[in-house]
Regions:
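A short, polar/charged loop-to-alpha-helix boundary motif
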Residues: 6-20, 24
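Ser/Thr-centric signal marking residues that sit
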Residues: 14, 42, 47
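Conserved catalytic cysteine-centered active-site region
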Residues: 28
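Zinc-dependent deaminase
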Residues: 45-112
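Non-catalytic, surface-exposed connector residues within folded enzymatic/regulatory domains
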Residues: 11, 15, 33, 71-73, ...
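Short connector loops at helix/strand junctions that flank enzyme active sites
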Residues: 16, 34-36, 56-58
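Immediate flanking context of iron-sulfur cluster ligation sites
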Residues: 31-43
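Short hydrophobic alpha-helix segments
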Residues: 1-4
Length: 112
C-alpha cells in the first residue's frame, strides 16, 4: 500500500501517510493485523502513527529522517519503549536520510 499525507486535502487531522497506508493495507489483506508487513516512511512517525503501527502489529519500521519536534519513535515520547506499548516493531531509523530530507523540504515548501 502507498499513501501520502492528506491532512489538508481531506480536512482530516488523522490523514497522515502512515495511517492511510495502514488502512489501505488492512483492506487489501482483509485483516487489521499486518504481522508480516514492513512500513517505510519518510519522516519519523508521530505518537498517533506509532500507536497505529503498534496496533497493526507491523513487523519492521523504516524511516528516513528523524523528527526531534514531533517524532515519537527515536525522539520525544519513544512510544515503542513505553510499558503501555503492546507490540514494538523492529525499527530502522535514518534509512536514506539525505533523500528523505530532500523530499521533506520540497513537501513543506509546496505546502507553504
Amino acid at each position: 500500500a502507498r499513501a501520502g499525507n492528506r491532512t489538508l486535502t481531506d480536512r482530516d487531522p488523522t490523514a497522515h501517510a502512515e495511517i492511510l497506508a495502514l488502512r489501505e493495507a488492512a483492506r487489501a489483506l482483509g485483516s487489521e493485523r499486518l504481522t508480516g508487513c514492513d512500513l517505510y516512511v519518510t519522516l519519523e512517525p508521530c505518537t498517533m502513527c506509532a500507536a497505529a503501527i503498534s496496533f497493526a502489529r507491523i513487523r519492521r519500521l523504516y524511516f528516513g529522517a528523524l523528527d526531534p519536534k514531533g517524532g515519537a519513535v527515536d525522539s520525544g515520547v519513544r512510544f515503542f519503549a513505553a510499558p503501555t506499548c503492546h507490540h514494538a516493531p523492529e525499527v530502522y531509523p535514518a534509512v536514506g536520510e539525505t533523500r528523505a530530507a530532500t523530499l521533506l523540504r520540497a513537501f513543506f515548501k509546496a505546502r507553504r
